Amino acid sequence: DWNNKIVVDVGAECGDTPLYFASMGAKVFAFEPLKKHFEFFKKNLSLNPTLSEKIIPINAAIGKDEQLKFYVATDDEHGTAAASFVSNNQGKNFKYELVDGYKLETARKKFDINHIDLLKMDCKECEFYLTDEDLKDIDRIKLEYTIRDKKYKLDDLLDLLKRNGFKCLIFRNGDRSRLSNRIAGNIYATKI
């Protein structure tokens, strides 16, 4: 039952997840940094006016309190797939897109988000900017992690979550060896 629950979606893209949780009764704060995705998101909201009343679309990134440079592909084949302010996943064919950024703690204060029932993150390494302070008053987290920069480690992310009272379950994205968990996957974390 998601009635009167608060969902924060970091990396909302076209808005499908916010629309789903709004249809289940939740109020959703949806952060999408990329202009192209945000325009599609707003279009989807306009096609669902009743549900859109429960969704607060925010054209910003979560990670750091500053203007962020996102690496975005310049060719149509890759579009905005895997765009990130943390790592260049685009190779040589990229451009920068400047985006307003907030630490999660700062965004919670700015948008008056006191308690989060579910934090959903799909943000291409921005999950590694989470802090102990960010994780206060959160019940559940579903995050997709991707590790491209070797300075980030899955164990560090799991330690942060466990230190803050979360029980974690890792789910692989595909049928690959367990070693692939170190590179990419999903973490489902529940406050215990």
Regions found by a protein language model. Name each.
Residues 1-192:
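Phosphate/nucleotide-binding beta-alpha loop and adjacent structural elements of enzyme active sites
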